[in-house]
């Protein structure tokens, strides 16, 4: 009888732990890439429309967009709307994203 109670208790604890791990995996998948992807091409066209060097701007913006899945609104600034976009830097420490 004591063995069966211990077995049932350990089985219930195992199921609880399994449920918690599964919920954590689902949450991390939602945060890390299964979110709705934005159209980087059109977002970067809007971002770079006033740039003096449009090809360079589109290339840098596209790279940043694919990594971060966001582009700040407007043609300049607004980095607070997309923290990942603002945090990417070149080897020299300058902002990578336009």
UniProtKB/Swiss-Prot annotation:
It holds the Pfam family GASA. One of its GO terms (cellular component) is extracellular region. The keyword Glycoprotein does not apply. It comes from the Eukaryota. Keywords: Disulfide bond, Gibberellin signaling pathway, Secreted, Signal. Belongs to the GASA family. This is Gibberellin-regulated protein 1. It comes from Arabidopsis thaliana (Mouse-ear cress).
């Amino acid at each position: 009888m004591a063995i069966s109670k211990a077995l049932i208790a350990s089985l219930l604890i195992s199921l609880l732990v399994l449920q918690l791990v599964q919920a954590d995996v689902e949450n991390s998948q939602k945060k890390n890439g299964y979110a709705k992807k934005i159209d980087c091409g059109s977002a970067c066209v809007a971002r770079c429309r006033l740039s003096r060097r449009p090809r360079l701007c589109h290339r840098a913006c596209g790279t940043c967009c694919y990594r971060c899945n966001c582009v700040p609104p407007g043609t300049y600034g607004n980095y607070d709307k997309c923290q990942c976009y603002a945090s990417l830097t070149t080897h020299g420490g300058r902002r990578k994203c336009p």
